[in-house]
Structures are given as structure tokens and as C-alpha cells.
Amino acid sequence: MRSALGILLFAATLSAQTQPPVRDQRTFRTGIELTSLTATVTDKAGHLITGLPRDAFQVFEDGERQTVTQFTNERVPIGLGVLLDISDSMHGKRIEDARAAVDRFLFTLLDESDEFFLIAFNHKPRVLTQWGRVHDEVTRALVALRPSGGTSIYDAIIESMPMVEHRSRQRAALVVVSDGADTASNATLRDVRSALMRSDAFVYAVAIDSPEPQPINTRVNPQALREITNESGGRTEVVQSSADLDAATARIAEELNSQYVLGYTSSHASDGQFHSIRVRVAGAEYRVRARNGYVATR
């Protein structure tokens, strides 16, 4: 999550919450170990809380209070990867609904300062578009999709990691859309969790869990997806039908547009060890979602 893992070093303007977010590339400085966090704050009912000041936040690493040195409650541009299931079970209306939801999500609900890439996966992942936001290119890629084969969610996430690392935007996120359990990956759930500990990306998943009878080993596994998303600071949306994809991705977009970005200089060295992170809002009954830790790469 630091140094070679794309730890963000904010421009000085980000420390002033009245300033607009910087919209150019991330910057790096040798020898500075600034750890960056993206945090989502909600009330008990799940409503997003925006506009909190820096001093409302407390950050703990391995139980030790850290000093928040960089902060913004303004929207920060994001580099986002969409990982779309095109296994055989996504045929017909499901792929049609997925195409429409992804298009609306990327070009209507996100900000023009954001960039993204697309990966489709069945028995293996395939990069459809590189970083950018060219509407015609995305449309052609989505229209050309023909569902077939198995499901390799874990391989798709692993495949996306180098692309996330080489983004030009400050925040990083992945959105996985799938209707099935992983049946074809070489990577394991443990491999994915390990990779995400070394990345600053947070992960969202939209799981289509149809009430229709399906073979047990192919039905979507929300618990496995939650293990991935919750640890990274994201979350899993479970929907009953592909018709609900629009609403689910709209909720994710609203969250991406309402997050806080915090930075602190860790009191720990880059020792190759896992360090836990906890973020809380002092004096308020709010819930804060952020990654639960990272591996400090040497």
C-alpha cells in the first residue's frame, strides 16, 4: 500500500478542504512513506455522510494513533476497473442489462475527470479496453460480448492489479459484476486477498443471486465476494435480477462521489509485514468503511 504499491502523495492543495481536488497525475517522492486511505462514512441507516472536517477523523495503525497530515472531503478523480462476467449463465437479458448498466455507470454517473478500463471474464479474463474514457470504444467492446464458458473472478482481479498500479488518477477502485461462483480460476481467494493487501484499490462487487434453481457449485458466492470487498474498504451488493444492476451501480457511483481521502506518515517502516488500520469518526455514531490493513512493501 506504500512505495511501489502506488501510495498516493497528495499535492499540497489537498490538505485544505476548501480547495478543489487536484485532477492531474499522482506524484511520488523518494523516502517519504505517506499512506493513503479512502474512507466512506455512513450513519446507522446507511445514509452517506459528507462534509466532515479533518479533525473529525481518527486513524490507528496497529492500534497506534496516527496524525492525519493530508485530507480532502472534496471529490478526488478515480481510476476504475470494471470486471464483467461473460460466462454462459450471463446470456440473454442478463448481458443486455449488464451492457446498459455499465455504460450508464461509466458515462453518466461518474465524473469526466475519471478514467477506467474494462475486463471481461469467463474461463479466463480478457482486457477489452485500456485506461481511457472513449465512449465509442467501450460501446463496441460491450456489444461484441458473447457469453460462454466458466467463471474466473479471481483471475480477473489478479489480472487487473498491474493496470491499477499504472493508473494516472489518485484513487483506485474495481467493480466486479457476476452471477456465478468462481469455477475456472488458477488463482485462489487467498491469492486475491494477498494481492489486495499490497494494493491501494478498494473493490465493489455486484452479485446477481437469482432465485431460480442453479447447480450449487455455480451459484454466485456472496460470502467469498464480501471477504474480498470488505477487507479492501468496498462492499458487495446482492441483487435478485439483472434488472437491478442499474440501481446497484448507481448506489456505488454515489458512494464513489462522496468519499474522503486521508493521508498519514506511518510510524512503521516498510518492513514487508501486515499492518492493521482502523478509521473512526470521533464523537459521532457514524460508521466508517476503509481498508483494514496493508502489507508494507520493502
Residues of each region from the PLM?
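Hydrophobic h-region of N-terminal signal peptides that target proteins for export
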Residues: 5-17
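Scaffold/interface architecture of coatomer-like assemblies
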Residues: 16-298
